Amino acid sequence: MSEPLKPRIDFAEPLKEEPTSAFKAQQTFSEAESRTFAPAAIDERPEDEGVAEAAVDAALRPKRSLWRKMVMGGLALFGASVVGQGVQWTMNAWQTQDWVALGGCAAGALIVGAGVGSVVTEWRRLWRLRQRAHERDEARELLHSHSVGKGRAFCEKLAQQAGIDQSHPVLQRWYAAIHETQNDREIVGLYANLVQPVLDAQARREISRFAAESTLMIAVSPLALVDMAFIAWRNLRLINRIATLYGIELGYYSRLRLFRLVLLNIAFAGASELVREVGMDWMSQDLAARLSTRAAQGIGAGLLTARLGIKAMELCRPLPWIDNDKPRLGDFRRQLIGQLKETLQKSKSSPEK
């Protein structure tokens, strides 16, 4: 039994033909041109690093959940109860002339005061680290602003935080370059081009030194446990040095927080770049055949230390990156390879002598 015919369907618009892509004209390369041909490199790092920046900003500004507020309220109530009970014990000991109990209350008050002071100090340092993110946002707004009146005060505050004296030659050149007719964008831009590179150069030197030490230590040390302890210690020292250069005093919790943010940023944006830099060396210069396995591991550890220093520099820096002033792993890669080759050649030539 045949199926009945389906009713006709009328369309409101005619069917649109799919556009066909036009092919480009054929190009024929000569033998000489084929040797010098190089494919265009596609760099996807800005998009990846934008995602990483969003993740870091989200971690730097955590949301205040209800449970966290309840815990903080409970701790505050408990602290007030402890203080009230201590005051009551002190009054009772004074009235009953119980000098032993009064001495115990005084000792407890000193301990509590020291604990509260350390907590306040740690909170202030952690708050200072969070304020650096707000300063970067403010600097980014000023770099796109055409208003007048905020740029100079903002830059003077940054110079004071970094410990740059008013009589410093770089700051004097900045003062000589600015005038009243310039807007905030131009003033902050001059500060970023004249004053900020001085601190960035010091941070680059620290990163190069610590990365070279990590590379050489891994290359010559036969103990993996010693290598791990040394790398962890030097990486923490590097973070402290960079934070000090940019005028941030790190406490215990702020140091842990910065280290966690740096590792988070590396996990998001650094893995692909690290693999690309190491792979570039292995493929182009055949390092696997020229260097030993320990030397290759040393280069990897040095690049990881350099990457950590770059991200710590980015999080501690009060200004956003402008144009191409951000340091790249390639800047440190060639230096690490040269230093490692020179060290290995010296170690091979010394026994022959």
From Swiss-Prot:
The keyword Transmembrane applies. It is a multi-pass membrane protein. It comes from the Bacteria. Its main location: membrane. The chain crosses the membrane at residues 70-90, 100-120, 213-233. Residues 1-35 are annotated as: Disordered. Pfam families: DUF697 (PF05128). InterPro entries: DUF697, UPF0283. It is found in: Cell inner membrane. Keywords: Cell inner membrane, Cell membrane, Membrane, Transmembrane, Transmembrane helix. Residues 1-19 have a biased composition (Basic and acidic residues). Disulfide bonds: none annotated. Belongs to the UPF0283 family. PANTHER family: UPF0283 MEMBRANE PROTEIN YCJF. This is UPF0283 membrane protein YcjF. It comes from Salmonella paratyphi A (strain AKU_12601). The gene is ycjF.
